[in-house]
Each structure stands twice: as C-alpha cells, then as structure tokens.
Amino acid sequence: AIGTARNLAKNMGVGWSLLDYYLVYATQMLYISEYGHPNAQTQIGRGFVDDNSAAINTGGTLINGNNTFGETTGKKQMSYRGIEDWWGNVFDWIDGLFCDSRRNILIGNKGFNNAGQGYENIGNGGSSDVSGNIRHIQSYDKAGFIIKSSGGSYDNDGLYDAGYLDAGYWPRLGAGWSAGSGGGPFQLYGDYSASGSKASLGV
C-alpha cells in the first residue's frame, strides 16, 4: 500500500520520503539529456527484467558506486548514476501523482496523501484508460512523460517503455523482475489502488 510505503520512508529519518513525480520527471530529463535516446535498455542495460521468478536483494551494484552500470542478460541489476534498479527487480511507489475518476491528472509536491487532495489539476488524461508502448505523451507541460496513446513495439519506437493511465489509480515506476523490453526509465503504470500490495511493489 502506498501509505505503508510512505510511512516506511518517513521512518528512515528526517527528510526521507518516497520519490515524488517531479523528482522522477527531473531524473528522466537528466537521462534523456545525457544519452539522447529513450531506449535506456540499449543505452545502459536491460536491468533485472528477463525471465526472473522473484525479486533479489538490493545492493548488487554497490561495487560501482555512483557510476552508471548495465549489461545485456536481463539477469543483473542496473544502476543510473547510483540509482539502483531505476527499472527492473521491483516497482517503486510514486507520490504526488494521481489520476482521478474522471482521468484528471493531479500532481503535487507537498502534503502527499492517498486521494490527491490539494494537488494541482494539470489537465485531463483522455476519455478512456490507455496502456501499452508509450507512443505519445500528454501535451501538458507538467505532465512529463505520462502516456497519452500507445502503439508500436517496446523494441522499435515511441519511448520503448510500457505505460498505463487508468482512472482512479496511483502510479508505480520502473518495471518488475519479468517486465522484459517494456521496462525502462519511462515505464509508469498508473494502474494500482492506494491500498494495493504485492511482492513486485515491495509493500
């Protein structure tokens, strides 16, 4: 559940929190500025995404410090500038982003809660739920790389990553241990209830 994850982060100490959407967006922009291509699985590495049956412990890339690391088997963790498992292994809950029942995209950077209360409505995400390879992104300046429409394949076009935007749901970022080519820095699944819990989310 996102509330449980939020509290666990706070319990780490003063200043700790879940990733919020604007921080995610900033990191995505840093990546695309540095590499100039959205297919991060070819630019950096697959991540822990291919035919794995369960999560593995974090820390697999500590030996690399803050250096970026990746490889091609899909059996090892990746790291981008010290951010381990930016995609692959388990998803991350993301705070400060919510798609309401009318598919309005609500974004906030403080006062995080389970209903999007007090968040800014930046625009409507569309007339129906959407999922698949991110072919087009929302046109609103603050929406970042949130999916607008899908098409093509994860290996050949668009953002090369999977996206979901479903009414009334919260986002999870990054891809799980068997996501395959749909994993990457832009994979954002807005398809999970605030009370949802599963192994691929950690809590």
What are these regions (language model features)?
Residues 1-86, 90:
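Short aromatic-cysteine micro-motif
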